Amino acid sequence: MKVQGSVDRRRLQRRIAGLLPPPARRLNISRGSEFTRDVRGLVEEHAQASSLSAAAVWRAGLLAPGEVAVAGGGSGGGSFSWSGWRPPVFGDFLIHASSFNNAEATGTPLFQFKQSDPFSGVDAVFTPLSLFILMNHGRGVAARVEAGGGLTRMANLLYDSPATLADLVPDFGRLVADRRFHNFITPVGPLVENIKSTYLNKITTVVHGPVVSKAIPRSTVKVTVPQEAFVDLDAWLSGGAGGGGGVCFVGGLGLQPCPADARLYVALTYEEAGPRFTFFQSSRGHCQIMNILRIYYSPSIMHRYAVVQPLHIEELTFGAVACLGTFSATDGWRRSAFNYRGSSLPVVEIDSFYSNVSDWEVIL
C-alpha cells in the first residue's frame, strides 16, 4: 500500500491566507502632504516595478494635458505615440445581425435610435446607407433613383430588405410628419470594430476622443462618409469644390485665414421630397455655421413653406444639425472609393478625426 505524504503546511498556509481580506490602509485626508504620501505608497504597493515610479505615472496620466502624435504624415493606418495620450471612450452596441451589413467600412458614422424601451438589451443602430434605405422606403423606385445615383445603388446592394430596417422604427412616418425623428436618433461615433455572429453583432464606436482601433497596438481609423451626401461649406461659399485647407472666401468679401481645426457636421432635414441626411465640413464658428446652413437650405425652406398650406405649428421645424467631431483643417479631406460586389461608391475620407458629438440644434 502506498503511503500518502504529509500535508504541505506552507501551501496550506498560503491558501488560507488567500481567503482572508487584505489589510486596510489608512489615508490621511486632513493634510494634503500626508494624503499625497499615503496615496503614493498605496500606488507603489500595487504597481509593477519599472524604470518610472508609479507615482510619476499616476501624476502624468491624471494631471498632464493629453497630446496626440501621429506617425505616418497624417495618412491612414498610422500609429499613435503614447506620450501623454489619453485613450478614447469606446461604446459597445449589441445589434441584430440582419440590420447591419458586415461589409460596412470602418470609420462609418453610426446613429442609434432609441424611443420607447431604454433598458432593451438589443440596440437599433443605423449607418448612412441604412438610413438612406429607411428614409426612401415606400417612396417608389423613381423617388429612390432621384435621391441619388451611386448612393442608391450601393445602399440597395448592402441592404436589400428595407422591411427589416423599417421594423426597427415602426412609427417612422409619424415621427417624420411631426418633425421629431431627430429627437430619438443620436450620433454615437465612427465604427472601429465589428464582431460578427449569426444572430447578434457586437459593434464598437469611438464616442469621444481620437478615432483609433480598439485592438492594441492602436492605429488610426479614417472616417468615411458618402461623397453624394457630403458638402464642403467653405468651398461652397467660395464657389469652388476643392478640399479643405488654405484660405476661405466669404461670399466674395475677401480672404480670411482658416483656423487650425475643421468640424464635421450632420444635418437631418425634413424636405418636401422626404427626410434627408447630409454631412457638412467647415472651419467656421458655430454661429456662422447656423447662418450659412439657413442660406444653403433657403431654396428648400421657401419651397416647403410656399407649397404646404396651411402649416401646422408642429410642422414648422425644417431640420436639425449636430457636430460629429473635429479634424485638421490643413490636412482636410480627400476623395476615395468604397467597393462592394463590383460596384463603387465615391466616398470622402478624413484622417486624424477626433470624435466629439454634440446635441441636435434646430436649423429653423
Swiss-Prot record:
Q: Does the keyword Cytoplasm apply?
A: no
* Keyword vocabulary terms for this entry: Capsid protein, Host nucleus, Virion
Q: Name one GO cellular component term.
A: host cell nucleus
Q: Which GO terms describe its biological process?
A: viral capsid assembly
Q: Does the keyword Transmembrane helix apply?
A: no
**Protein's cellular compartments:** Virion; Host nucleus
Q: Where is the signal peptide?
A: none
One Pfam family from the UniProt entry?
Answer: Herpes_VP19C
Cross-referenced HAMAP family: HSV_TRX1 (MF_04018)
Q: Tell me, in a sentence or two, what this protein's role is.
A: Structural component of the T=16 icosahedral capsid. The capsid is composed of pentamers and hexamers of major capsid protein/MCP, which are linked together by heterotrimers called triplexes. These triplexes are formed by a single molecule of triplex protein 1/TRX1 and two copies of triplex protein 2/TRX2. Additionally, TRX1 is required for efficient transport of TRX2 to the nucleus, which is the site of capsid assembly.
Tell me what this protein is called: Triplex capsid protein 1
Organism name: Epstein-Barr virus (strain B95-8) (HHV-4)
